[in-house]
């Protein structure tokens, strides 16, 4: 604030008045309409009214409300008395702003504009929140994928992985993260990560039986556009809206080295391949027909590839591989047998082991399901012994009175039955060691570790309603085929036609279907307590 003494030496004039006599002034800021009315004379008798309620200006018997705010730059006002003297008028420390009064139409317009601005602001806020949520979901999905592939996310701190809290060098986020999948669309399955293309997976599916486009899309997890572009090249659509493999494409089918195939699947593929080559009128010495006769060589090679060290043998959880077409099958029986020979564990037979003892034994004996959900390992003797009552063991959609007994074919096939399948765990269960043979200590560290591993796998295993409905549909479609095979085999024995060359093939297929349907039934039964099918 400027005082008298501050400018007495700067001005060549005499100053009149003192600080005590000069009143406090108030600066009034008037709107343009009010000022024009005052200058034109339409507004007269202007006075200022100050009260406890507030400050207002009276003009022509009308009151105008004002807002009092402190002056941002307080100053003094002087009046020139004559050419040689100035008189202090007062000090300005407050400013009055006259409120502008609007009519009802203008007020409504301003109100609507304010509401629109608020609405636009809220919409922008919602869009921003949604975008942030999408980026968070994408980040979480990438971290989950890296964790699944055994990689640690780049932004993981040292304290979260059990290290010291010292500062660590974090790689730059701009560096590209290598993806393990060689496929253009990473579906998360192991065959896709190994680089098996979509064409091969579609061919392997259609080689078993014609399938619909929706089924292929569900199994391969491929986009609809890629699937629609590929199908006309390898298949044709029949009158049932199903895609059927073209005859020339059967030469690209991998019959014996395709791990997800079961025994029934391979038999079906071989039959369809033979018919396709016959329709193409290929000569008997054609190179394509060599794919049908190299069975023993490829099976031996496949078993050698599946053999794993005994210390790596782990119990496998009951995974429905009918959702994943190309999931690798269980280790072969030879690996478990080698473990038996090394550790002198007695073999299990049909007399001391049965898959019907407990639900846990079902889960232990069941391996990864193949394309139709069947076990890719050999069928156990316990499965074949239950063939005399297949209709009661498996839920039947129709009557079972026409089905005869298979006890006599089972007795004749006992000498050439397939090798026994053991539970996937290398230790025999308590139910299998009933005759006082070797049994591991229940409190041993290895057994506790095995039990903890199995419990963890069971907690991690979850089934969706869509997957279980697909399996139930497959069960209903496959059961009539099993029933017809059962009747055919029974008719051979009823007619004493056991020397028929087709009998062995039909019996192998019947045993495979029996094990396959039983595995499906156990899967559906386990999931029925969690899902409403």
UniProtKB/Swiss-Prot annotation:
InterPro entries: E3_ELL-like (IPR042065), WH_DNA-bd_sf (IPR036390). Residues 112-126 have a biased composition (Basic and acidic residues). GO terms for biological process: transcription elongation by RNA polymerase II. GO terms for molecular function: transcription elongation factor activity. Its main location: nucleus. Residues 139-150 have a biased composition (Basic residues). GO terms for cellular component: cytosol; nucleus; super elongation complex. Residues 112-193, 303-460 are annotated as: Disordered. Keywords: Coiled coil, Nucleus, Transcription, Transcription regulation. Belongs to the ELL/occludin family. Activates transcription elongation by RNA polymerase II and pyrophosphorolysis as a complex with eaf1. Elongation factor that can increase the catalytic rate of RNA polymerase II transcription by suppressing transient pausing by the polymerase at multiple sites along the DNA. Forms a stable heterodimer with eaf1. Ell1-eaf1 complex interacts with RNA polymerase II. Deletion of ell1 renders cells sensitive to the drug 6-azauracil. This is RNA polymerase II elongation factor ell1. It comes from Schizosaccharomyces pombe (strain 972 / ATCC 24843).
